[in-house]
């Protein structure tokens, strides 16, 4: 069966479908029938709208959700900026270093001393969240549960790629459990709390500052394939009912700065909701992989799970691409990804296993690489020599492995933390990968 066999059981119930109009109520009758904001909402609830696009966005792009909650989201004290030394998402665009070097990182460390909010580290990015342009690439590593707290990003949509450990995510709209080999998208503004039911966690995030993630167009593939809409899971309504005053802290990532505010009630008090703006998760094991059944290696765009499109058709601010287990059957073909210089930037990570274009040992689970715009890259020496001389029988590759890529049309700058502070950059990446490549050319015009 094309699903991942998880060792940690998911206790939650979900609604299925990508970009579907869902509705859910934790108490029967909490959803108004036939209208959105009645004079008095059922059970004394407040009606509140959560907008993910402008009101007048085209219908096929419009993202809105109506929620019915015990107290409005506005009921909190003023926000105060946190001490900059306490978090790691801050990036002045001028301080990002844009360099043409190919970069590769050793596995990033687990950190059992911090929670989700304080375990976010900006590695690279481009653009400006204040004008809703660009993206940010973050690593997360945490070992503590969030307490009576909630967090949201006003900057963009978080696409979370779990690499190690289990995330129990309590959102305003319901609960999701996210395990390695699953991804989760939490839209801009949705408040949530992360607890860790199976110990420390680590993974990757691509924050999309503009627009929202979509399924890629399938074109000649047809009506099914790649990530199918029915396999995405959205939460059902669930709420905490705390009648007495209880202090909560609300964190906001706002222009990559961290702010906090106090409130005297739970943020997780939405009893019912309906709309198409909500968090969701997806099991990467359900991806229906396509490939060549004749010759040549296709473009990696055929492995796209989700895309964050730019204003130029066919060009993405962020594509999320995976390299799952698959059969290679192409005849008379160099089967690994080819050598490449790309007008797009490519940030890669490894959830588990290995990657067929990097067999030399330096690309490891929980590590990463960045090949920026027009920075040459491709198979290392070991991969080239092996694939050039391999017996071209049908071969299954990637069993137990899952590599991924955040690809962007933007030139990506690297943060001080990503380049130096983390101390994970492999200084000899080029020396180990491509400098050992041998000259095989023999000019037929010259006497042998």
Swiss-Prot record:
Q: Name one Pfam family in it.
A: HgmA_C
Offer an example of a GO molecular function term for this protein. Answer: metal ion binding
Which InterPro entries does this one have?
HgmA_C, HgmA_N, Homogentis_dOase, RmlC-like_jellyroll, RmlC_Cupin_sf
Pathway recorded for this protein: Amino-acid degradation; L-phenylalanine degradation; acetoacetate and fumarate from L-phenylalanine: step 4/6
Q: What induces it?
A: During growth with phenylacetate and phenylalanine.
Q: EC top class, in one word?
A: oxidoreductase
UniProt keyword list: Dioxygenase, Iron, Metal-binding, Oxidoreductase, Phenylalanine catabolism, Tyrosine catabolism
Task: Respond yes or no to whether keyword Oxidoreductase is given for this record.
Answer: yes
Q: Name one GO biological process term.
A: tyrosine catabolic process
Q: What cofactor is this protein dependent on?
A: Fe cation
Reaction(s) this enzyme catalyzes, per UniProt: homogentisate + O2 = 4-maleylacetoacetate + H(+)
Q: What is its EC number?
A: 1.13.11.5
Give binding positions for Fe cation: 340, 346, 377
Family according to the record: Belongs to the homogentisate dioxygenase family.
Q: What is this protein called?
A: Homogentisate 1,2-dioxygenase
Q: Which organism is it from?
A: Emericella nidulans (strain FGSC A4 / ATCC 38163 / CBS 112.46 / NRRL 194 / M139)
């Amino acid at each position: 069966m094309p699903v991942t066999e998880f060792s940690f059981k998911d206790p939650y119930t979900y609604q299925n479908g990508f970009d579907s109009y869902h509705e859910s109520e934790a108490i029967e009758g909490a959803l108004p029938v036939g209208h959105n904001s009645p004079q008095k909402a059922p059970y004394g609830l407040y009606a509140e709208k959560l907008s993910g696009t402008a009101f007048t966005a085209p219908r096929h792009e419009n993202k809105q959700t109506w929620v019915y909650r015990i107290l409005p989201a506005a009921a909190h004290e003023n926000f105060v900026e946190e001490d900059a030394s306490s978090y790691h998402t801050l990036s002045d665009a001028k301080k990002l270093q844009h360099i043409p070097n190919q970069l590769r990182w050793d596995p990033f460390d687990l950190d059992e001393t911090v929670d989700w909010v304080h375990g976010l580290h900006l590695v690279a990015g481009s653009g400006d969240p204040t004008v809703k342009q660009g993206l940010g690439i973050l690593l997360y590593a945490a070992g503590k549960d969030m307490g009576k707290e909630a967090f949201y990003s006003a900057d963009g949509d978080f696409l979370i790629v779990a690499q190690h450990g289990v995330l129990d995510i309590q959102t305003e709209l319901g609960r999701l459990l996210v395990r390695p080999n699953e991804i989760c998208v939490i839209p801009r503004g949705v408040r949530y709390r992360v607890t860790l039911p199976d110990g420390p966690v680590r993974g990757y995030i691509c924050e999309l500052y503009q627009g929202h993630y979509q399924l890629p167009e399938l074109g000649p593939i047809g009506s099914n394939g790649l990530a199918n809409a029915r396999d995405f899971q959205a939460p059902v309504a669930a709420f905490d009912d705390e009648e007495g005053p209880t202090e909560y802290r609300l964190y906001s990532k706002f222009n990559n700065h961290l702010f906090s505010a106090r409130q005297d009630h739970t943020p997780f008090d939405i009893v019912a909701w309906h709309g198409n703006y909500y968090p969701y998760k997806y099991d990467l094991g359900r991806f229906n992989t396509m490939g060549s059944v004749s010759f040549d290696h296709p473009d990696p765009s055929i492995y796209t799970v989700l895309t964050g499109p730019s204003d130029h058709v066919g060009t993405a601010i962020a594509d999320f691409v995976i390299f799952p287990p698959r059969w290679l059957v192409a005849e008379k073909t160099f089967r690994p990804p080819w050598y490449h210089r790309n007008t797009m930037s490519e940030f890669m990570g490894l959830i588990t296993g290995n990657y067929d274009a990097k067999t030399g040992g330096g690309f490891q689970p929980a590590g990463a690489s960045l090949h920026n715009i027009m920075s040459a890259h491709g198979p290392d020496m070991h991969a080239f020599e092996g694939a050039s001389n391999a017996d071209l029988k049908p071969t299954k590759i990637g069993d137990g492995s899952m590599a991924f890529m955040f690809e962007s049309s933007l030139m990506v700058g690297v943060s001080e933390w990503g380049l130096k502070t983390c101390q994970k950059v492999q200084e000899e990446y080029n020396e180990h990968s491509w400098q050992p490549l041998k000259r095989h050319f023999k000019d037929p015009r010259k006497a042998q």
